[in-house]
C-alpha cells in the first residue's frame, strides 16, 4: 500500500476536531515560552499522564526538551485571539498578555476551560515531531465553553440535533 502524500494526509487529519491548547514553560534564561498546539491528548489516569507533540523545526524545541516542568492551558471559546497569537511567528508572544504562574512557575492563562501542570516524564521521537509525555501534578477546570479546531478553522462545540 502506498503512503498518502502530505497534502492528502493533512486534509484528512483536518477532518478530526480537536481542542486547542497553549503549552508553556520557562527557558534557561527565565523567560516564558509558549505555543499553540492541538496535539494534546490524555494517556493514563493512573498515573495521570498527558501528551502533546512539537515539530522538530520549532524554535521552542530546545526549551521544552530541557525543562523539568510544563503547563497546558486548554483554551475557552473566548480565547481565539490568544490561540492565534501563540500560533503566529511572533518574537515575544507573551508581551502584553496577562498570565499567572503555576506552583512550579510555569505560565498559565486565566479564563481557560482547564489547565494542567506537569513534570516532564518522557520524550519520544515521532517522525518530524517530538512527543512529550507529562505527569500531571495539578489541574483545574471551569464551566467555560472550550475552543475547538477542525478543517483549518476555530469553532465551538454544539449538541447534535438528535440529542439536543
Spans of model-derived segments:
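Basic, polyanion-binding surface patches
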Residues: 1-164
Amino acid at each position: 500500500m502506498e503512503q498518502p502524500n502530505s497534502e492528502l494526509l493533512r486534509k484528512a487529519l483536518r477532518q478530526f476536531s480537536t481542542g486547542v491548547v497553549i503549552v508553556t514553560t520557562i527557558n534557561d534564561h527565565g523567560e516564558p515560552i509558549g505555543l499553540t498546539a492541538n496535539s494534546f491528548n490524555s494517556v493514563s489516569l493512573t498515573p495521570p499522564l498527558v501528551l502533546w507533540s512539537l515539530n522538530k523545526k520549532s524554535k521552542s524545541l530546545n526549551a521544552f526538551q530541557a525543562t523539568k516542568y510544563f503547563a497546558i492551558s486548554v483554551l475557552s471559546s473566548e480565547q481565539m485571539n490568544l490561540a492565534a497569537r501563540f500560533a503566529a511567528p511572533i518574537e515575544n508572544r507573551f508581551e502584553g498578555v496577562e498570565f499567572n504562574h503555576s506552583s512550579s512557575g510555569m505560565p498559565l492563562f486565566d479564563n481557560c476551560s482547564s489547565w494542567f501542570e506537569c513534570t516532564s516524564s518522557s520524550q519520544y521521537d515521532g517522525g518530524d515531531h517530538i512527543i512529550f509525555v507529562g505527569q500531571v501534578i495539578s489541574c483545574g477546570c471551569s464551566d467555560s465553553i472550550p475552543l475547538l479546531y477542525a478543517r483549518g478553522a476555530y469553532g465551538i462545540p454544539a449538541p447534535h440535533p438528535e440529542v439536543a
